[in-house]
Amino acid sequence: MRPLVRYRLIPWCLRQAVCQPVSKPIGYRLISTRGGNRSPQGKKTIPLLNKPESSNVGAFPSAHQQLLSLKPITPNDSFISSTVFDSKGAIVAVSKKFQKWEFLRKHALYPRDLRKIDTSSVDIIPSIQVKPNNCIVLNMLHIKALIEKDRVYVFDTVDPSSAVKLGVLMYDLESKLSPKMGTQVQYYEHRALESILINIMSSLEAEFKLHYSICGQILIDLENEVNRDKLRELLIKSKNLTLFYQKSLLIREVLDELLESDDDLASLYLTVKKTEEDDFSDLEMLLETYYTQCDEYVQQAESLIQDIKSTEEIVNIILDANRNSLMLLELKITIYTLGFTVATLVPAFYGMNLKNFIEESYLGFGAVVVFSILSAYLVTRANFKALKSVTKLTMLKSSNPSQASYNMKTNSTLRPALARIRGLFKWRKNPDSNGQPIWNKQDRDVIWKWLMDEKK
């Protein structure tokens, strides 16, 4: 059996392929020389790479290539664009444009629903709006979608980061909605809803891990050193963490409202019609799973926010303590300065170029020095004593609790007796049992007359 290709000619074919550039990216196929295909000279021809019969192959990119290069779009007042999936999970169209009013009329939507599916950069409150026996309008984070019983519309976005997440969602939807996944227990609309919720929870998890790593590292750094730059960074990151907490909290509330309403649960069945009396255990388990996961992110974010607030309070206490220490140091310096000023006041008087009758005294200099030092010491000691009483942080004046309680008991027994004695000497009237003086009618008339004269 002769070889199909002469190996000596392979290098020549490779050189020809390299030297002759191809103008168009066209697919090729191999043609066998078996069956007597010969050249006019009677020799067997070398298999060639010939063009396929169809010239349209490779002319347009596939839907998968478009999803890989999914890009944000420019908003339009007349059209909305979306990627469409059919009942088998296949991509029917990528970034297909629809007229807004025609789209609303076709899917029995109201003009107020246009804001939830419109391609815009405005973030609105997450919602899952159910149109009974018609469709499910979903708006959560970066996903705006419309789910029917045999079709899914995922609307495009203008945010580049959201466009990347939507590209991941497209592949998840395609694999989840495909009938090749095996026996499908869930309905079509529930599979689409679960794929969207999985993407939402994955986005929340990735965002929370980012916030936790950044804020946690800042908190660890602040435990070792209170830095102004770290505090500023913590303030900025705490704002972003608060926004994440609010987003996850709103998503949890949306899922909670769905679980609490049997009417909405019944309306989520589009393939089959169900009422409030039917069993929704499969759908409830689906929603409860992602509700629990979202609640976990809410609790963790709330705990991290509380840690940040506690750290801020501790930092404020430390800063207040440092500020008080600086003020105390300033007061001490002022007290020492005052003592030094008092000490130099008397020598200043003594050094005046005037007669003070002690210039010729042998004890004058020593007396002035001793008097100056003593006066400075007394003034400084008195000021430090006053400062100590001000800075003493106790609830009671006495630092000894037993002594304070004894003083309170003594005061409670001696106070009425002292009040009686004070009343005898002060009022010159016999006091009553409470220590108050007893006034007669004549005394009251004198006091009343005195008050009236004073008003005039």
Curated annotation (Swiss-Prot):
Transmembrane spans: 326-346, 360-380
Statement: the UniProt record of this protein carries the keyword Transferase: no
Superkingdom: Eukaryota
Swiss-Prot/TrEMBL keywords: Ion transport, Magnesium, Membrane, Mitochondrion, Mitochondrion inner membrane, Transit peptide, Transmembrane, Transmembrane helix, Transport
One GO MF term attached to the UniProt entry: magnesium ion transmembrane transporter activity
Localization (cell): Mitochondrion inner membrane
Transit peptide: 1-38
Motif YGMN positions after renumbering to this chain: 350-353
Membrane topology: Multi-pass membrane protein
One of the Pfam families matching this protein, by short name: MRS2-like
GO cellular component: mitochondrial inner membrane
Record family assignment: Belongs to the CorA metal ion transporter (MIT) (TC 1.A.35) family.
Function: High-conductance magnesium-selective channel that mediates the influx of magnesium into the mitochondrial matrix. Essential for the splicing of mRNA group II introns in mitochondria by affecting mitochondrial magnesium concentrations, which are critical for group II intron splicing. It also suppresses a variety of mitochondrial intron mutations and its absence may disturb the assembly of mitochondrial membrane complexes.
Record-given protein name: Mitochondrial inner membrane magnesium transporter MRS2
Taxonomic source organism: Candida glabrata (strain ATCC 2001 / BCRC 20586 / JCM 3761 / NBRC 0622 / NRRL Y-65 / CBS 138) (Yeast)
